[in-house]
Amino acid sequence: MEKIRLKLRAYDHRVLDRSVSAIVEAVKRTGAEIRGPIPLPTKIRRYTVLRSPHINKDSREQFEIRIHSRLIDIVSATPDTVDSLMKLDLAPEVDVEVRSMGE
């Protein structure tokens, strides 16, 4: 059929890894060839906020959010593979981006 690329993102790497392993299991059961999961670089967003609402500019607090991501390529996807991916119940914290890559 065609090549499907899945890009998964989450703030918690443990939840992300559980979702990735569920996807890999489902795809392997259908007999499709899979490449990955490939860990992509973690994006770190840092925010600096004043601690006091009025004075003390020198007193600041820093927060950060880490966004972990993985990439999975399904090389020979069949209609069975697509059906099993649609039926998967993944964690709500995981953002899944699906792209169809032409042959």
Curated annotation (Swiss-Prot):
InterPro entries associated with the record: Ribosomal_uS10, Ribosomal_uS10_CS, Ribosomal_uS10_dom, Ribosomal_uS10_dom_sf
A GO cellular-component term linked to this record: ribosome
Pfam families, A to Z: Ribosomal_S10
GO terms assigned for molecular function: structural constituent of ribosome; tRNA binding
One GO term of the biological process aspect: translation
Keywords, comma-separated and alphabetical: Ribonucleoprotein, Ribosomal protein
Source organism, top-level taxon: Bacteria
PANTHER family on file: 30S RIBOSOMAL PROTEIN S10 FAMILY MEMBER
Function: Involved in the binding of tRNA to the ribosomes.
Family statement drawn from the similarity comment of this UniProt entry: Belongs to the universal ribosomal protein uS10 family.
Subunit record text: Part of the 30S ribosomal subunit.
Record-given protein name: Small ribosomal subunit protein uS10
Species of the source: Nitratiruptor sp. (strain SB155-2)
UniProt lineage: Bacteria, Pseudomonadati, Campylobacterota, Epsilonproteobacteria, Nautiliales
Chain's gene name: rpsJ
